[in-house]
């Protein structure tokens, strides 16, 4: 067998593997660097970041990158965006780690 071919196929399979998270009956594509769901600054990303840093549940997101674009608060978010934030928060609560402030 051609080891280069095997290596290439293995790499392709790893890249093709999708990661999903289901929360409150909704399944989210959380494939890093491939899914709009986990884009930096989006509701899912902000929820997971708030959980990671030990912050309170406070739905928000950024139109673009975090800190470099307009911040949208809960009152301006759609119900779907609030659910996406909540899913990100819960995702990190279940599978993520927490910032070591130590």
Enumerate the language-model features and the residues they cover.
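Intrinsic-disorder/low-complexity detector
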Residues: 2-102
């Amino acid at each position: 067998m051609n080891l280069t071919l095997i290596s290439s196929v293995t790499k392709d399979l790893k890249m093709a593997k999708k990661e999903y998270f289901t929360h409150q009956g909704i399944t989210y594509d959380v494939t890093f660097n491939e899914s709009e769901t986990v884009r930096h600054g989006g509701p899912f990303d902000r929820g997971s970041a708030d959980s990671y840093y030990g912050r309170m549940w406070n739905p928000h997101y950024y139109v673009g990158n975090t800190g470099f674009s307009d911040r949208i608060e809960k009152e301006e978010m759609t119900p779907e965006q609030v659910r996406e934030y909540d899913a990100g928060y819960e995702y990190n609560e279940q599978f993520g780690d927490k910032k070591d402030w130590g």
